[in-house]
Amino acid sequence: MFNLKYFLVSSSLLFSVFSSPVFSNPKVLKVGAIPDQNQDVLDKRFNLFSKELSKQLDVEVKYIPVINYIAAVTGFRTKDLDLVWFGGLSGVQARLQTPNSIVIAQRDIDKEFKSVFVVNKNLELNSISNIKGLKKLKNLRFTFGSENSTSGRLMPEYFLNQAGVEIKHFKGKKAGFSGSHDATIALVNSGAFDAGALNKQVWENNLKNNPKRTSNLELFWITPEYVDYHWVAQGDLENRFGEGFTKELKSVILNLDIKQKSHKQILDMFNAKRFIKAESKQYKNIEEIGRKLNKIR
């Protein structure tokens, strides 16, 4: 259902962010990212990344936080953001709305990405080894992450459908949408929801670094592989930053070296060993699934 209040609040916040003086300066490279995790984590990661880009490209680079996935796509479409870290679905949505945009790179882990399904321990549900076991989630309180998340909604819903489970089969004939992977963990861990789906990397990071946050959770199932996150850039950056800028930008990202201390800090925060080349055609299957589930029209 359309929520007018939410739309107006989101729109006003979006306007206030993108009306900042930095947006009137054509010589500032504006970096954005989908808010898939806690904002403190994102701020640290992308401010560090932006600082390195600025150093190597010799231009001012500014990280601009956004309030939700839609704001990231909108900011890119309106050219208020120049370079954005998108998930598979949001990247496809952004590129379809922004002619001549360019896929710059993906992490080494993004060619073979996975989601996980987790359940609250109180359910005493055993983990499954076959997709058909997802039927055990019927009639439970289930939450996805953001409505436009690839690893927290699109692909989990796709796999659920493959097992014959639709949103109407959950308790109350609906699913929750936590907004981020961290929030999904918190909601299922607290018992507010019985089960949820999220990014496998975020799950593993929380297991390792925040054991209290996952103390009431059990891993239920790991999905098959699919392609996910990627950097997407505007196609006209050279008009503002000079000939060869896009190629140089791509080179800087691809050449981040885990053997260099400052680069390792960045790569560690992306849970990657390196960035690799990526092409838009790799995301064709994501687009097809997005259309099937009415996330792309």
Curated annotation (Swiss-Prot):
Entry's Gene Ontology BP terms: transmembrane transport
Keyword tags: Periplasm, Signal
Subcellular location, principal: periplasm
Transferase listed as a keyword: no
Compartment(s): Periplasm
Role this protein plays: Probably part of the ABC transporter complex PhnD1C1E1. Binds strongly to inorganic phosphite and with very weak affinities to methylphosphonate (MPn) and phosphate.
Identification of the protein by name: Probable ABC transporter phosphite binding protein PhnD1
Lineage: Bacteria, Bacillati, Cyanobacteriota, Cyanophyceae, Synechococcales
Gene this chain is encoded by: phnD1
